[in-house]
Amino acid sequence: MRRFLKIAGVLFAVAVGLVFALVLAAGVAIQTGHVANTRVVAGNKLPSRVTKLVADRAEFFPGERIRFFYSAAMTPGGDGNVLTDRRVISYVDDGSDAWCEWLMLEDIAAAEFAFRGDFFEDSEIVVAASDGTSLTLYVGAEADGDERFLDAIREAAGLDE
């Protein structure tokens, strides 16, 4: 019986150690930008690696700066929804298909939730331009990031005036 308890204790300690190591590795991967954060992130909080990757994928104009970013993909390069100081941008690059769509802030006539998500499902924000075109953004609801993202779009586009 004592031998069984020793073995069970060792196995339990190994399991706890593995879980701790996985959580630590995930945290490091998120902080370094190798794995996308599960939350909406302010531009000044993004790792420089992610900022450069997003600028490339979203085809930034010279001097353009990120205000908010969210990725629904495993990596920031695979998918991005971005608010900059000039545009609202959505891009996808899944390896076989890549596209990038955007609206200039001065062209935005409306921005609203099409669907309010929760911890497990992203919210959908529809941004409409004055010419009738629109852009759908998928934004994480965790820690009210979707509300902060939408409020920032409205403020940047002058819709709250």
Language-model features: locations:
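Phosphoinositide-binding peripheral membrane targeting modules
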Residues: 69-123
